[in-house]
Amino acid sequence: MKQIGLISPNFSEDTLVDVYKILPEGIHVEGRNLDVARYIDSEFHRVEQTFADVVRELTRQPLDFLMITGELFLSYKGPGSDRQILASVSEITSVPASTVLTAVVQACRALNMRRVVMASPFPEDQDLRLSRFLAHDEIEVVAHRCLGYNNSKVIWELSPETGYELVSSLLSENPGVDGVYMPCNKWRITSVIERMEKDFGKPVVTNTQAWVLEALRGMGMAQPIPGFGRLLQ
């Protein structure tokens, strides 16, 4: 049995439902919650103070890989902050580790997505910061549209169709982009990835897809996984 450690701003067992649909059998995810109340900088700063302790506690268990999710937490200090976080993790543990933003950048590059549209459930200011972060890694967010929510509980209740409709609107106005990026693992959009790619003819990168693939690669277990978009095929 392989084990992935997962640190997330708003971890819950419910969040793993889509993860286990994607992961091959024989892999367990052990999660820890940073407990971000709202997606604002003061909250990100607060949980940053306890982040190292969470890493230490989680990595006392036998882990094959450690993944840190939460695009907004990872990007709130600006471009390159994912690398800073990974550097701090490497001082605590020898467990191979990555972040969801590192994984998203790798996923976009793998699909030749240099010019993208971003559909998100987040507030406008957080989308703009995330766009600047991606630009630092040479991924241009040509246009973005957001739903404006700063609370994971509200986002969790959103229908997958909210993602589909947002992407449809963005691509109708920006048909020349290379693909679509959709952040947030609390936005339950995994079930509509294939339909969006089929209907709109563009590859789609989401939070969950990207970090799962990154973790599988890190454990030497990458394999084609049908049903969840081109990235995993």
Model-identified regions with their sequence ranges:
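Short, flexible loop segments at boundaries between secondary-structure elements
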Residues: 149-152, 200, 204-224
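Hydrophobic alpha-helical
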Residues: 164-196, 206, 211-212
